[in-house]
């Protein structure tokens, strides 16, 4: 009996019971959970990747905003398994309520629009809690700090707290931090390479600004974002402003539809001002997928791709 009691005590000490309730921040709002959610819906491929990294599939009853925009990878499909897609793009309240979720993990312009049908306030009225993607908070709170990799780290740690997986979340962040340090040590000293990210748009380019995690990723890879002074996360600027900065390197976003990155490059090569920039003339670019450039686990490998491509001078 004494041996059994000792074994029980040692097991209890090694695996402490995680205390609930827990309270976390969501764009300045405090959200309290009395127990881990059991019926979460996740919007967008990058946020689904966060949930999958913490192996939360058993607590998910749906995803939204996947097939309407992207072609997924075989790995994503395997990890998603039989979790249904409730809406191919932005969900309606009807889509969500029908799944009877207790949590919606989304963001502003990542499944929700300010003043729209689906917001934390309208969901709360239905008994559904919301965790808002930190990168997107800038759309309602102009006092946010400039982008850093904490946008990813903090969201994963928060998700771990909510689901009682703090240790697993911390292990992920520690591993990513170590990888980033290795990348940092590989970046040559000297002036940062001028980088332009081209997402979409012909009359005006849609790109990453001061509060987008992509700006922090570019910096971690040894570059500087030529549109990094835009007071937004994602937005539009002018071709003239981009060309005046004379980017030396391009990141082309490949949504896996149409002609992808090659089509973007062809457009830039035919453009009257962008065709004169060093990056376009030398065809120095790397093509990356959406989930690599929005907050999610794929960011880390993407930073390494950018760093290697910049050093190599071309994709």
How would you name each of these model-derived features?
Residues 2-8, 14-50, 161-198, 309-315:
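Bacterial Sec-exported substrate-binding components of ABC uptake systems
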Residues 26-28, 83-94, 114, 230-239:
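Short helix-initiation/N-cap motifs at beta->coil->alpha
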Residues 46-49, 66-69, 103-104, 109-113, ...:
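Solvent-exposed loop/turn segments at secondary-structure junctions
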Residues 34-37, 44, 48-49, 93, ...:
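Extracytoplasmic/secreted envelope proteins and their assembly/folding machinery
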Residues 146-155, 161, 249-315:
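Structured C-terminal subdomain patch of bacterial secreted/periplasmic proteins
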Residues 69, 207-234:
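Alpha-helical, coiled-coil/dimerization segments enriched in small aliphatic residues
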Residues 110-118, 128-158, 191-213, 261:
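Extracytoplasmic ligand-binding site segments that recognize negatively charged/polar headgroups
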Residues 42-99, 103-104, 108-112, 226:
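A short, structured surface patch at a secondary-structure boundary
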